[in-house]
Regions:
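Short amphipathic alpha-helix segments
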Residues: 7-27
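Helix N-cap motif at beta-to-alpha junctions
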Residues: 9-14, 43-49
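A generic structural motif
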Residues: 36-44
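Intrinsically disordered, low-complexity segments enriched in polar/charged small residues
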Residues: 24, 34-36
Length: 59
């Protein structure tokens, strides 16, 4: 499992979830932390190095 905090200004959580679920065939979940930030979690990803590279674009 990998969890990061991302700003709503950077990317919509629904768009990011769709992109990651299609690319890595895994499950995602997100929840609002405050009005500007959400917590995004990824479960069941086998290629964590590539996932971290992708998430680094948004953090």
């Amino acid at each position: 499992m990998k969890t990061v905090l991302i700003s709503y200004e950077t990317v919509s959580p629904a768009v990011l979830a769709h992109k990651i679920e299609r690319a890595f065939a895994c499950m995602t979940k997100y929840r609002e932390v405050d009005e500007d930030t959400y917590e995004f979690s990824v479960f069941g990803c086998t290629d964590l190095a590539m996932l971290e590279d992708l998430l680094a674009e948004y953090v």
